[in-house]
Amino acid sequence: MTRAYLAFTETGLVLAKRLAGSLPGSVARCGQNGISLAEWTSAQFVHSDALIFVGAVGIAVRAIAPHCKSKTTDPAVVVVDECGRFAVPILSGHLGGANDLARAIAAVCGAVPVITTATDAHGIFAVDEWAKHQNCMVLEPERIKLVSGKLLAEQPVYYRTDFPVTGTVPAGLFPADTPEKADFALTLCPTGQALHLVPRIGVLGIGCKRGTSADTLEAAFAAFCTRHSLAAQAVTAAASIDLKQNEPGLLAFCQARGWPVRFYSAAQLRSLPGQFTPSPFVQRVTGVDNVCERAAVLDADGSLFYPKFACSGVTLALACRPFAPDWRWQNA
């Protein structure tokens, strides 16, 4: 988490530096070195994961108001009074991590964390905070309130998961008898009206002909997702053979998706143990019998989830990084 602290007085600056000593981040003082409240807030809203105002809540609220867009994209915002008595998360408490940050700040300076989200106030399971702790993407944030509302009303909430989850199941949660009954689901393949939490664990292995365009790769990926009912948000990176490291279309496709792409030599791919879909043609051209499956598994250091899929001269496969979810939804 990248943090940015803003103080307004010398006393506040001392506290900001103290906090940054334990919870690293940039430190600035409003009015010093030409720093204005509006400019600092505008810049840090884009570049930082968390903004910490050491001052009054009202100042922070007015500063961030023009920039607030979505609970899924807004950074965490916490306000700490300059005497370090209270730490108040005011934006992105769960998905952005502001509640956890307020608790961490409180632990450093002895403040009281002032947590006002309803699930925290009642000490009950917060599905969006759980998703963040399990490195999952929330596909339908508007459905969070439906799950939380049931728990707050002491109604049963049903879940389904495609992965074993360790630990004690939180109060009020019960496994769904059928997929249709689930209120939320931990899955790579969302279906139905549940709130879907998608683990960010996928690596897309890619093979393609020379000169393949980004548009062709995008169309192939869309077809791949449709074939498997896969949420595109599950993919976090791509991998291929080093023969493709200068392919403009491949690089542009990955850049547009925001994925890092890593390349491996034929020798590295050949050295990977396991059963993969062989191709004599690919063997002749690249020196290894399969590119997409091997590259995905090697990069993920995990297991093959979906095997080779061919479309318009493109081959794709999905491997998943090790994933061991538990029922923890807050930092200890």
Residue ranges and their predicted role:
Residues W40-V46, F184-A185, R294-D301:
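Conserved phosphate-binding catalytic cores of ATP/NTP-utilizing and phosphoryl-transfer enzymes
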Residues G25-I35:
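A short beta-strand-loop structural module common to alpha/beta enzyme folds
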Residues M1-S26, F305, S312, A319, ...:
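N-terminal basic/disordered segments at the start of proteins
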Residues G12-R18, G34-S36, Q44-N99, A104-V108, ...:
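Conserved mixed alpha/beta catalytic, RNA-binding, or beta-rich assembly cores of soluble enzyme
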Residues I241-R294, A300-L304, A310-V314:
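C-terminal non-catalytic interaction/assembly regions of soluble proteins
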Residues L23, C109, A256-R257:
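Short, structured coil segments at secondary-structure junctions
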